[in-house]
From Swiss-Prot:
Protein name: PCNA-interacting partner
GO cellular component assignments: chromatin; cytoplasm; nucleus
Subunit structure: Interacts with RAD51 and PCNA. Interacts with PARP1. Interacts with TASOR.
Tissue: Present in testis (at protein level). Expressed in testis, gastrointestinal tract (jejunum, ileum, and colon) and immune system (thymus and spleen). Weakly expressed in lung, kidney, pituitary gland and muscle.
Positions of the UniProt region annotated as Disordered: 463-511
Length: 573
């Protein structure tokens, strides 16, 4: 019964291929078998969980429950008393978008399209219930229970060899599927790093996000990136920040190998010879680095022989149909083949590969769903990560961890200290005259400015400074004139003062009682009485000269910036 339904599914696919122009837009549209449908549904559920719960994962029980509901819902079968997971509509939409972007159709879509276009002579096509039983694997389970020849305890070694052979077959068919349909991301996920090209989960993640950003398939994104590097030149090269730069070597090897297969497909006119050369090229890549005694090497050899035989059988069967139907042209005219997805000489080989892939899509589903969906490196080192693990790879967010409070306070204090040190170091050559402790606060001016005139305010300030000179003022005069406390250097004061008096006597326009710049300070009236300063204020702070001991030069000086008058007098000499 299972074999009968499998043949019915294959007949349905053949009817679809005969009228492909009415069903799809491209001749190279590939079909998803039961296993590929289940994998696509799993990825859709994981994507939905990531959007709603933030984690790209899904448990096996939810996948099987949704798979059962999905088959009944899409085949328009009764779904009473059937459980369904949350957000099923979003899952279904994600599933349909994934197949559409991959240029693929599942068997249920093929069944619906063929049901609309089926003629009266083809009413013997498979029913919806039979297709449901075939996709769910119910018939296979019943057939195994009724088969008395199945061993009760299979040998472990033979089971491992069988798994390796199935893996090798999957790799070959994935290469052929990507060769026919370059948009098939599911096939690319299974062969991107087979054999090892250094394209692990990180490379797959970067390629996936780059493809989504530019709305391309993953293989077309990789091809575009490599072609830009090879043919675009420096002006068209991707930016250095592109994450694909780290995987240039592996992506270049993968794209060049697919180009080599496409060259064989387009240059060899004989479909049988072209198929054999393509399989031989894939075989050479897979067995590189393996000895002839390894199970994987033997499995690859067996798969190559089996696929070569199947290709020859397909060609022979098509030739027999062509001879029997003499009124149908075996090959469309050359003008029709132009601009139909491939060159004319390679179109026959593409048709043969499509038939080979359709036969695989009509094969029975895998009984062990857990091994199909969640098997990571079961046949290491050839199996690699599962499809869910590859698509789960998230974008790594570079976030700095939060530092402890003690460390943050220490960092801020250290930064403030360094800032103050930089401010004190960057000074001019006259920085000795700019002292923070000598600058008068603004509050002192604001309190008395409203009640007293400016001239009286200046006189009071001069008298107060002359009567009670501060230590800061003495320190200012000492630092500005480079005079130290020791008495040996204190004797040089009169010499400097006499030189300044001689210099002032040569300038008739400058008065002794007013030493200021007329552009910066107000003119002082002549009738202002200058208050005398006590003589005991001339010696303060260890014998230093007080400001009032300099011949009353600073008594009428306008208080601007300390040292400005001295600098002005220096440049007037």
């Amino acid at each position: 019964m299972a074999v009968l339904n499998q043949m019915s599914v294959l007949d349905m696919i053949k009817a679809f291929r005969r009228n492909w122009r009415a069903h799809c837009n491209s001749e190279r549209t590939t079909l998803c078998g039961p296993d590929s449908m289940l994998l696509a549904l799993q990825l859709s559920m994981a994507e939905n969980n990531k959007q709603h719960h933030g984690e790209f994962t899904v448990c096996l029980s939810d996948v099987l429950l949704t798979w059962k509901y999905f088959l009944h819902e899409k085949l328009n079968l009764p779904i009473e008393n059937m459980k369904v997971v949350d957000h099923y509509e979003d899952i279904r939409k994600t599933y349909d978008d994934f197949l559409k972007n991959s240029n693929t159709l599942d068997l249920i879509d093929v069944y619906k399209k063929c049901s609309i276009m089926t003629s009266n002579c083809e009413k013997h096509m498979i029913s919806s219930i039979q297709l449901r039983d075939f996709l769910s694997g119910t018939e296979c389970a019943v057939n195994d229970e009724n088969n008395p020849h199945s061993p009760a305890s299979p040998v472990k070694c033979s089971q491992n060899d069988k798994q390796v052979r199935l893996l090798a077959k999957k790799i070959f068919l994935s290469y052929l599927s990507l060769l026919v349909n370059s948009k098939n991301d599911l096939a690319l996920a299974q062969i991107l790093n087979t054999p090892d090209r250094g394209l692990g989960r990180e490379a797959f993640t970067n390629l996936k996000h780059a493809a989504r950003e530019k709305q391309l398939s993953m293989f077309l994104m990789a091809t575009s990136f490599i072609r830009t590097l090879e043919l675009g030149g420096k002006g068209y090269a991707p930016p250095p920040s592109d994450p694909l730069w780290a995987h240039v070597k592996g992506l270049s090897a993968f794209v060049n190998f697919i180009d080599k297969l496409n060259e064989i497909l387009g240059e060899v006119p004989n479909p049988s010879l072209a198929g054999g050369r393509i399989l031989s090229a894939i075989r050479t890549q897979l067995i590189k680095g393996h000895s002839s005694g390894e199970p994987f090497y033997k499995a690859v050899e067996e798969v190559v022989q089996d696929l070569n035989l199947r290709i020859k059988n397909i060609i022979n069967s098509q030739e027999g149909v062509t001879v029997s139907a003499t009124n149908i042209s075996p090959v469309p005219p050359k003008s029709f083949a132009i601009n139909h997805d491939t060159a004319y000489c390679g179109r026959d080989a593409v048709k043969i590969l499509l038939v080979l892939l359709d036969e695989d899509a009509a094969s029975a589903p895998t009984r062990n769903k857990a091994e199909l969906l969640y098997n990571d490196q079961s046949t290491a080192p050839h199996g690699g990560a599962s499809v869910l693990t590859l698509f789960r790879s998230p974008t790594q967010v570079k976030s700095t961890p939060v530092k402890p409070l003690r460390e943050r306070i220490h960092t801020s204090l250290q930064a403030e200290k360094n800032k103050q040190m930089r401010q004190t170091l960057i000074r001019s050559q006259f920085a000795c005259t700019y002292k923070d402790d000598c600058i008068m606060s603004k509050s002192k001016w604001n309190v008395n400015s409203s009640s007293k005139p400016l001239s009286a305010l200046r006189l009071e300030n001069d008298v107060s400074e002359g009567a009670q000179p501060s230590v800061g003022k003495a320190r200012l005069e000492t630092s500005s004139e480079n005079v130290h406390v020791d008495r040996s250097k204190d004797d040089k004061g009169p010499r400097k003062s006499t030189k300044r008096k001689l210099a002032k006597s040569k300038q008739p326009g400058v008065r002794e009682d007013i030493h200021c710049d007329q552009g910066d300070e107000l003119y002082q009236p002549k009738n202002v009485k200058i208050l005398k300063v006590p003589s005991d204020s001339h010696r303060k702070a260890g014998g230093k000269l007080a400001p009032g001991a300099r011949g009353n030069r600073c008594t009428t000086k306008d208080k601007l910036i300390p040292g400005q008058t001295k600098l002005t007098r220096f440049f007037m000499l």
